[in-house]
């Protein structure tokens, strides 16, 4: 491509293009498509102005070869192709002499006949898309836009094409020739695909008042004014290559930019080790609910009353016993804890009036489970600073874990529909302005797609548990309070339903700092036999506590009911975020909106209705080993929501690091996919940064395996 550009274009144009690229730190040898695009644009600007003059009478005339003495003035001032400082100087002087409004961005030409700036566009895509992008970018009625394409189409503001037919035909013919020349050398496809949308660089904000004074005060030494400094920055000529810049910074740094090819990326290395285990604060797909429909009992809405009434709906309780002990814990204590909960609930029932909250007796099993008196005693530093061998505890490296299949199943389940609705329509907030008519239409469509989703159940369950736990932590700091895990929903028929998942007992909670930990024991009902995937339940002690009759196609069957018990902990900041899990709805709604926006801008009308109602169309959801998975728009909504919810449920430093670092690699691979010929340095360092986050977290490991699927398909 580089050779082609040097043969095909006038050397002056090539030189200007090289200068322009170096000014932005780009290398014409690497970004060859961009090099070709800049040359083409320059040539079109020059052809646009060629042979057009204004005579003594101020009339516009075309002179191809004439009397050199005629008093002619060029009709167009060429701004494109000058260095930025000079270009702005020209623009400013035109504005001062003609009174035309100063543009925010550098235009390409000025037309002395029509007295307007002109923005020229040359596009490899459809002219109307590019026209819209230009118009959106410059947002000025005054600048005239004229777009040409390589297929001979053109589009201009108000269909006013400025030039005569013949001059425009010359430009179109030249563009068509360039296209054919490229195609004959096999360069056209890559060039056509490499076009990016408009980028906004040249914004000029007028700064006045206090801000202006602050700006003047904070200039680097030797600059008298902001204009002065701006002109210096605009005119600053970097040498164009990152290598040069880096070598100025440090003697030790040497960066060679390596081309990133389809053969370059390798898959991420996932850790070996025992399979990873469940670490969410509450059970997800394995949870079991005891429910009451149309609750109307006394004290309905008071958690303890609701819980007792849910417990009464079940008749299959039996003597509990341990069927999957916890590897490290004192398992009989977990058993005694459950027995204590049952006994204390029974005591409440026997009282005349049921209290609103229940504080558990501080038995030895509860003290053990909640880590009471386990924290090492804090000693004032003053008292021990003279101790000679004072040192911090050695902490063990976390043990590596391998990806287990259960986390993908958890995710699939989170995307499914349940038979209840978990949010009302107004869960996402109300309209304020008329513009929001479209917004509320989108919101209603979106809510309809996700209101029955299991991920939405997890949101409401998370909000409830975190709110209750934070409340109790502040209101009953010293008490071992019993907190029921409750959610509310509506059945298909619109009947209200209250669900009990189990109980939490919180430990002492004198939470001064955001990160101070409150311990709690969770006890959750389930029908999942832990012996099927013992590695998933490593952190739990599981009891069998009853038998449940289930209606199936073949009649009633009895299934053992289990109780998953574990010690866990959380902090004020984690509970605060847990209480705000509804934000996941908003995040995924915004992702869907940007998809609708993209469609709408192509079709030039709002596509919300078509988007949600065209049931036949499928959309990309994600990548699996089989390739790109597609599904209905509802499935896309639910998948995006589930991702957002899992990011919240499985939030961790490993996830933060993985998301930030893998995104860099993702962008490089996408650039490769778009034939933008990306280059990298220290790719090994990037891989290291990503892989140091792959330790033992199930959600991070799953994301890494998805990333590998994406890599495989992206570089094919």
Swiss-Prot record:
GO cellular component: host cell cytoplasm; host cell nucleus
Pfam families: Flu_PA
Any GO MF annotation of the entry: endonuclease activity
The keyword Oxidoreductase belongs to this UniProt entry's keyword annotation: no
UniProt motif (Nuclear localization signal 1 (NLS1)) ranges: 124-139
Record carries keyword Cytoplasm: no
Post-translational modification: Phosphorylated on serines and threonines by host kinases, including human casein kinase II.
Enzyme Commission number(s) of this protein: 3.1.-.-
UniProt short sequence motif Nuclear localization signal 2 (NLS2), positions renumbered to this chain: 184-247
Binding site for Mn(2+) 1: 41, 108, 119-120
Binding note for cofactor: Binds 2 manganese ions per subunit.
InterPro entries on file: INFV_PA, PA/PA-X, PA/PA-X_sf
Subcellular compartments: Host cytoplasm; Host nucleus
Residues engaged in binding Mn(2+) 2: 80, 108
Family affiliation: Belongs to the influenza viruses PA family.
Function (record text): Plays an essential role in viral RNA transcription and replication by forming the heterotrimeric polymerase complex together with PB1 and PB2 subunits. The complex transcribes viral mRNAs by using a unique mechanism called cap-snatching. It consists in the hijacking and cleavage of host capped pre-mRNAs. These short capped RNAs are then used as primers for viral mRNAs. The PB2 subunit is responsible for the binding of the 5' cap of cellular pre-mRNAs which are subsequently cleaved after 10-13 nucleotides by the PA subunit that carries the endonuclease activity.
Quaternary structure and partners: Influenza RNA polymerase is composed of three subunits: PB1, PB2 and PA. Interacts (via C-terminus) with PB1 (via N-terminus).
Protein name in the entry: Polymerase acidic protein
Organism, scientific name: Influenza A virus (strain A/Ruddy Turnstone/New Jersey/47/1985 H4N6)
